[in-house]
């Protein structure tokens, strides 16, 4: 998990929940389109972008490759691959907007694109145009590609241990 001083809660997202939430996002985006294409922010935006591409019948999908997180913390922005143009007619997709650092960097590169995320936290929410679910700033979202199924102690047992 990430920095324990920054994240007090955990929000596990299953593959099924992510799919439902991304389909809900597609309903909101239908009235904004059609889009020329989708730009997925790697790596978190890849799965939502694939679902949105299917639901919105978008065949052109590109990526912006940015590194800002590791499994422990959020760091500085490193653009590994950009995209040409100003983003007009394009849909930018990411799984989450947290502090807004990554989103602001992408906004600077593609100022005319429509920016959508599945999940949004209060600090980053103003940077995106469309999102589905808001979670508190102190919540770590555990995405299905970052986890595996394992046994977890019942809450009452964990409380007694701690």
Curated annotation (Swiss-Prot):
One of its GO terms (molecular function) is guanine phosphoribosyltransferase activity. Xanthine binds at residues 98, 141. Pathway: Purine metabolism; GMP biosynthesis via salvage pathway; GMP from guanine: step 1/1; Purine metabolism; XMP biosynthesis via salvage pathway; XMP from xanthine: step 1/1. Signal peptide: none annotated. It is found in: Cell inner membrane. Keywords: Cell inner membrane, Cell membrane, Glycosyltransferase, Magnesium, Membrane, Metal-binding, Purine salvage, Transferase. One of its GO terms (cellular component) is plasma membrane. 5-phospho-alpha-D-ribose 1-diphosphate binds at residues 43-44, 94-102. One of its GO terms (biological process) is purine ribonucleoside salvage. Guanine binds at residues 98, 141. It is a peripheral membrane protein. GMP binds at residues 98-102, 140-141. It catalyses: GMP + diphosphate = guanine + 5-phospho-alpha-D-ribose 1-diphosphate; XMP + diphosphate = xanthine + 5-phospho-alpha-D-ribose 1-diphosphate; IMP + diphosphate = hypoxanthine + 5-phospho-alpha-D-ribose 1-diphosphate. Mg(2+) binds at residue 95. Its EC number is 2.4.2.-, 2.4.2.22. It comes from the Bacteria. Its cofactor is Mg(2+). Belongs to the purine/pyrimidine phosphoribosyltransferase family. XGPT subfamily. Homotetramer. Purine salvage pathway enzyme that catalyzes the transfer of the ribosyl-5-phosphate group from 5-phospho-alpha-D-ribose 1-diphosphate (PRPP) to the N9 position of the 6-oxopurines guanine and xanthine to form the corresponding ribonucleotides GMP (guanosine 5'-monophosphate) and XMP (xanthosine 5'-monophosphate), with the release of PPi. To a lesser extent, also acts on hypoxanthine. This is Xanthine-guanine phosphoribosyltransferase. The gene is gpt.
């Amino acid at each position: 998990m990430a920095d324990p001083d920054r994240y007090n809660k955990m929000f596990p997202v299953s593959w099924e929940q992510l799919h439902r939430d991304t389909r809900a996002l597609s309903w909101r985006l239908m009235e904004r389109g059609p889009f020329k294409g989708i730009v997925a922010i790697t790596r978190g935006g890849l799965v939502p972008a694939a679902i949105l591409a299917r639901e919105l019948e978008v065949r052109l999908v590109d990526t912006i490759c940015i590194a800002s997180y590791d499994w422990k913390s959020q760091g500085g922005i490193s653009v590994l691959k950009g995209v040409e143009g100003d983003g007009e007619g394009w849909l930018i997709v990411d799984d989450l907007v947290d502090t807004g650092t990554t989103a602001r960097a992408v906004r600077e590169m593609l100022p005319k694109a429509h920016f959508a995320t599945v999940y949004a936290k209060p600090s980053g929410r103003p940077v995106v145009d469309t999102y589905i679910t808001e979670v508190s700033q102190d919540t770590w979202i555990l995405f299905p590609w970052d986890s595996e199924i394992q046994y977890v102690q019942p809450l009452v047992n964990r409380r007694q241990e701690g």
